[in-house]
């Protein structure tokens, strides 16, 4: 079997592919394959039972912890206390390449990670870098529980001297138009000089990490992380519609969080129940928010390539290195 002759360290990505599934309901032969992709961009396919594929994937991961496993396409990680932690792996670029799974993980705060969550991130996803987009005040209140051997980068996206205000105070300041407030907030994330420098630093860190997976996160993983993810995916050549779909995945992930915040808000500010609509604007992403980002990039900066080069200082050489590092 050819699999026996492939050095494990030469394998970059392995996943199961199922062929023959028929949505019409008619019986059809279903074949499971183990798909292996090597550092030389060679692709191999092995006909196996589903159990054999799963056994091989587990063994390969033990032999090579850096190996990317699975075909997540932006799906949520199976974690207990982190509802919006997602793997950007397997998202496809415009030229047909894929992001390597288990390398780029977007998330909300990881302060509430359970022991089981920490084990999964450390052992199964081989997390070696954490990038924290939150303010110093947010970090002080809920610091990340950094795992052994993990490098931590604090890159606050918003200028703390100007951001101020607690979460509930921001809700109260919306004056019944939370969506307008959020669109302006998104606009500031890619026009404010301080925020742009921080996003540029984020891309630079991604470019220079040595090995393992990177978790980058804010508080809920929607806004600062959502914009950062969009900029990263643009830099990797992922099409706009794919970026929009990934962005909108935060809503089902945060349904329970929104319910909890509604209860908390009612208890804290019972006299302002009419503000609950504005609270929803904070805890749900909307296409109009990310479209604001797209419009600023395209209409005010001459397109994404010009924006990446002039605003985020991503040179053509750095762009190619980033793609080489995370795409296959």
Positions of predicted regions on the chain:
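Cys-dependent protein tyrosine phosphatase-like superfamily
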Residues: 2-215, 228-328
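Ser/Thr-glycine-rich phosphate-binding loops at phosphate-binding pockets of nucleotides
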Residues: 219-225
């Amino acid at each position: 079997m050819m699999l026996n002759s492939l050095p494990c360290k030469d394998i970059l990505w392995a996943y199961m592919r199922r062929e023959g599934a028929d949505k019409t309901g008619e019986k059809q032969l279903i074949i499971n394959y183990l798909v292996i992709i090597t550092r030389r961009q060679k692709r191999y396919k092995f006909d196996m039972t589903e159990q054999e594929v799963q056994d091989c994937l587990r063994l390969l991961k033990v032999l090579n912890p850096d190996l990317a496993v699975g075909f997540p396409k932006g799906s949520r990680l199976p974690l207990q206390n982190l509802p919006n932690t997602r793997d950007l792996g397997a998202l496809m670029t415009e030229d047909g390449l894929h992001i390597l799974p288990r390398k780029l993980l977007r998330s909300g705060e990881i302060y509430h990670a359970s022991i089981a969550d920490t084990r999964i991130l450390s052992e199964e996803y081989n997390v070696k870098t954490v990038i924290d987009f939150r303010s110093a005040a947010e970090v002080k209140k809920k610091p990340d529980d950094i795992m052994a051997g993990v490098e931590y980068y604090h890159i606050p996206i918003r200028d703390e001297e100007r951001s101020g205000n607690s979460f509930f105070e921001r809700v109260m300041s919306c004056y019944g138009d939370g969506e307008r407030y959020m669109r302006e907030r998104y606009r500031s994330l890619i026009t404010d000089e301080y925020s742009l420098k921080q996003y540029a630093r984020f891309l630079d860190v991604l470019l220079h990490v040595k090995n393992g997976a990177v978790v980058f996160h804010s508080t809920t993983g929607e806004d600062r992380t959502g914009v950062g993810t969009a900029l990263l995916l643009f830099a990797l050549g992922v099409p706009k519609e794919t970026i929009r779909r990934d962005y909108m995945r935060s809503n089902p992930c945060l349904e329970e969080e929104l319910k909890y915040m509604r209860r908390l808000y009612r208890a804290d500010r019972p006299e302002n129940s009419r503000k609950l609509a504005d609270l929803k604007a904070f805890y749900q992403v909307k296409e109009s928010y990310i479209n604001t980002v797209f419009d600023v990039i395209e209409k005010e900066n001459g397109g994404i390539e010009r924006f990446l080069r002039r605003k985020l200082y991503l040179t053509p050489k750095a762009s190619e290195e980033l793609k080489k590092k995370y795409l296959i």
